[in-house]
């Protein structure tokens, strides 16, 4: 998000910033639906360490371009003080379609998400991974929760972005697909009937990206610091390998769309303080216990992928999420102080141990060799 340091409101200057970017940033920066929003896009990376280096470089380049215009850059799931009346939308062919179809929904306050991709080798594997990742969306959301304020108020939610974005169609947890043909047939109905022009207008929490050869997770709030992004990247990559090689998740949970949807809400409301439904045991389980068990299962996969140092950062994120830090800043200075904190933390360096990992031999990777991309 782009911020005006005069009062930490949203700055409506994304098109002007895009025109002033240096060449090395042009291919990695895009406008979004709102004029206060820019998207940074990484390249695919074989390991989390090299991704971390690029994300820091992109943030420094963007911050310099934004600061040259007297503004600042920040990142979170929502701007906690803005209202729909303060926002301006972007004009482009794609976003004209969004605005025309979404009407007032597309003109409300912008939401900011972190979208992660993992590479897979074939379409059937992509469907299988997408199906199984649905069970892990609540934990990923709880860890990433970074939007407690909306229109200047404490919402009582750790991720208010989640229910706000739910107002859009074609969002939330997708159904399980039997195979790639089943996925194609489901999407084809929407395209042939004119509901969407192409599959990227499906904004599910996890979705296939056939043109990239990836599975994409979209449930996450944008992260204020790169270190938090790297923790989520490592967990996502490790969980993907775990599911592809071991099929870790309970089939009972995967077969319960009601439990998956409820866990998503609980994670958005309570973050890591949530208690999540366990259909197999017929009970609620603290999210911290779910995470502890998952971290233990992921540890050998993180070692194989070269992201063990990044995965270790998950523990700190579980103790203090972006939402927790915003709430702490707001206790003394109100929500606007939390927005100022987003700008201060935008270039916070990651821990020094997060150096690019050495290349791993192919035998140590799963058949899918999932690269990480943010």
Q: What does each model-found stretch correspond to?
A:
Residues 5, 43, 71, 76-81, ...:
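An acidic- and aromatic-residue-enriched active-site/binding cleft used to recognize and process polar
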Residues 92-113:
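Acidic, His- and aromatic-enriched active-site or binding-groove loops in soluble protein domains
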Residues 70-87, 151-155:
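Short, glycine/charge-rich beta-strand/loop segments that flank catalytic centers
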Residues 107-133:
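Internal, well-ordered domain-core segments that constitute the primary functional module
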Residues 122, 130-177:
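An exposed, glycine/acidic-rich loop-and-rim segment of catalytic or binding clefts
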Residues 84-96, 155-171, 264:
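Short, low-order "capping/linker" segments at domain edges
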Residues 28-33, 66-79, 104-111:
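Short, flexible active-site-proximal loops enriched in glycine and acidic residues
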Residues 1-69, 98, 165-361, 365, ...:
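C-terminal accessory/tail domains of diverse enzymes
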């Amino acid at each position: 998000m782009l911020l005006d340091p005069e009062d930490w409101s949203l700055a409506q200057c994304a098109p002007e910033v895009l025109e002033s970017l240096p060449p090395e940033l042009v291919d990695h920066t895009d406008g979004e639906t709102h004029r206060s929003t820019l998207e940074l896009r990484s390249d695919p990376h074989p390991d989390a360490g090299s991704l971390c280096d690029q994300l820091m470089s992109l943030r420094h380049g963007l911050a310099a371009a934004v600061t040259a215009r007297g503004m600042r850059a920040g990142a979170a799931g929502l701007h906690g003080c803005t209202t729909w009346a303060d926002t301006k939308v972007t004009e482009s062919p794609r976003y004209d379609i969004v605005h025309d179809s979404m009407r007032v929904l597309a003109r409300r306050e912008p939401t900011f998400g972190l979208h992660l991709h993992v590479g897979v080798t074939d379409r059937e594997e992509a469907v299988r991974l997408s199906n199984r990742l649905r069970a892990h969306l609540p934990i990923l959301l709880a860890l990433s929760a970074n939007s407690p304020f909306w229109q200047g108020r404490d919402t009582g939610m750790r991720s208010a972005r989640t229910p706000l974005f739910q107002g859009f169609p074609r969002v939330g947890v997708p159904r399980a697909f039997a195979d790639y043909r089943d996925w194609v047939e489901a999407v084809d109905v929407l395209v042939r009937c004119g509901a969407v022009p192409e599959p990227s207008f499906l904004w599910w929490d996890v979705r296939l990206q056939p043109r990239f050869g990836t599975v994409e997770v979209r449930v996450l709030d944008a992260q204020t610091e790169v270190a938090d992004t790297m923790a989520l990247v490592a967990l996502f990559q490790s969980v993907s390998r775990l599911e592809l090689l071991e099929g870790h998740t309970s089939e009972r949970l995967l077969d319960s769309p009601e439990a998956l949807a409820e866990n998503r809400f609980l994670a958005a409301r309570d973050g890591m303080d949530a208690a999540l439904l366990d259909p197999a045991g017929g009970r609620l389980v603290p999210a911290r216990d779910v995470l502890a068990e998952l971290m233990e299962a992921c540890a050998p996969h993180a070692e194989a992928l070269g992201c063990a140092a990044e995965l270790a950062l998950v523990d700190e994120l579980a103790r203090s999420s972006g939402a927790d830090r915003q709430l702490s800043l707001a206790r003394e200075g109100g929500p606007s102080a939390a927005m100022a904190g987003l700008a201060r933390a935008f270039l916070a360096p990651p821990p020094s141990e997060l150096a690019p990992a050495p290349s791993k031999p192919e035998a140590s990777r799963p058949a899918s060799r999932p690269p990480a991309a943010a």
